Every structure is written in C-alpha cells, then in structure tokens.
Design a protein with these regions (language model features):
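Conserved SAM-binding strand-loop segment of SAM-dependent methyltransferases
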Residues: 7-18
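Short "lid" loop at the C-terminus of a central beta-strand within the Rossmann-like core
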Residues: 19, 37-38, 64-70, 104-106
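A short acidic, Gly/Pro-enriched loop at the edge of an enzyme's catalytic core
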Residues: 19-30
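A short, conserved alpha-helix within the catalytic core of class I
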Residues: 38-50
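Class I S-adenosylmethionine-dependent transferase superfamily signal
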Residues: 49-54, 93
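Conserved beta-strand signature within the Rossmann-like core of class I S-adenosyl-L-methionine
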Residues: 57-65
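Short alpha-helix
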Residues: 80-103, 121-122
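Core SAM-dependent methyltransferase catalytic element
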Residues: 109-128
C-alpha cells in the first residue's frame, strides 16, 4: 500500500478465502496474522498450513484479541469463540520455538472502532 511505497518497501498483498487458500510448502520467510479472528477449527487448520508454508527459520507473528476483550468496547469480535487464549494458541504451533509470548492489556490504535485499552494475545514463533 501507500505506507510501504512511501518507505520504499515492496509489499505484495492478496485477498483470499483462508479456508481454501494454498499457502504452499516451505515458501515464506514470515507470516503475519494481526487481528485475524477465525473460528477455532479453521484457525488450527490455517496455522498448521502456515507452519508448513514457512521455510526453515521462518517466523509467524501473531496478535489477536484475548478472551478478556469481550465487552470492553475497544474492538474485536463480539463472539467469544473468536477470541483467543495464549496457552491455546501456543499449542497450535507444535515444534516451533517461541520467541515472544504475551497476554495482557495494551493500548490499541487501529482505527475508529479499534481504539483504547485492549486485551491482546501476542505470539512470535520460529520454525526449526
């Protein structure tokens, strides 16, 4: 987008249905999942395909609203099943090295409907 261009960075984006999108095998150095709230079964499937799609040493950077975000009014889905728990998400990356894990409150400024103190879960993992 415009921010990347202004910084002289090339970014390729795709709009796709994650239920069927082919991420490939050992194709990516990094995968970013920011506030991508999926039903648990689909999330597990997408994460498994994501790890398979990483090259050795590749990383996944993940952030989503945690279970305690419900009712805060600062963003996130209103369905409890779409919110995540850190321990649950850790288990979805078996065999990966955890580089960063956090569950707690932080200020979120992602636009008009996602602003204020939010309970987030962050995880950065590396494929061996």
């Amino acid at each position: 987008g415009r921010l990347a261009a202004a910084q002289g960075v090339d970014v390729v984006t795709r709009v796709a249905d994650l239920a069927s999108f082919d991420l490939g095998l050992a194709r990516w150095d990094g995968i970013v999942s920011i506030f991508m709230h999926l039903p648990p079964k689909l999330r597990r499937e997408v994460f498994a395909r994501g790890v398979a799609a990483l090259r050795p040493g590749g990383v996944v950077l993940f952030e989503a609203y945690g279970k305690g975000q419900l009712g805060r009014g600062t963003g996130g889905p209103p369905e409890p099943d779409l919110l995540v728990d850190l321990d649950e998400v850790r288990q979805e990356f078996p065999g990966c090295r955890i580089l960063h894990a956090f569950s707690g409150l932080r200020e979120v400024h992602e636009g008009r409907h996602h602003s204020g103190t939010g309970e987030v879960v962050q995880l950065v993992v590396q494929k061996p």
